[in-house]
Amino acid sequence: MMRGGMGNMNNMMKQMQKMQKDMAKAQEELGEKTVEGTAGGGMITVIANGHKQILEVKIKEEVVDPEDIEMLQDLVLAATNDALKKADELSNSTMGKFTKGLNLPGGMF
């Protein structure tokens, strides 16, 4: 009886190690995936990776109005928030498959 218990424990440890390895790989892949946030009908584009790092900001020339810098700032902010929201969604969908059923506090995948 003791022997079966140890076998189950070893099996569980192997499963945990595999899950840990798979999670590390998924985290690494998140850094390679990108999402795009936009505002102003595509006049502003912000590109972020799955680690929520902003990689690029594109501003179309016609949206730049020296008389209305505030509008440009608002559009950049909106596009950035859109990109970060999409990065969150990407992270949650990627990492969520590992934490399904673990009852982690909200916002943790």
From Swiss-Prot:
GO CC entries: bacterial nucleoid; cytosol
One term of GO molecular function: DNA binding
SUPFAM superfamilies named in the record: YbaB-like (SSF82607)
InterPro entries per record: YbaB-like_sf, YbaB/EbfC
UniProtKB keywords: Cytoplasm, DNA-binding
Statement: the UniProt record of this protein carries the keyword DNA-binding: yes
Major place of residence: cytoplasm
Cell compartments where the protein resides: Cytoplasm, Nucleoid
Claim: Disulfide bond is one of the keywords in the record: no
One Pfam family, short name: YbaB_DNA_bd
UniProt superkingdom: Bacteria
Stored PANTHER family: NUCLEOID-ASSOCIATED PROTEIN YBAB
Family per record: Belongs to the YbaB/EbfC family.
Record note on quaternary structure: Homodimer.
Function: Binds to DNA and alters its conformation. May be involved in regulation of gene expression, nucleoid organization and DNA protection.
Protein name: Nucleoid-associated protein BC_0025
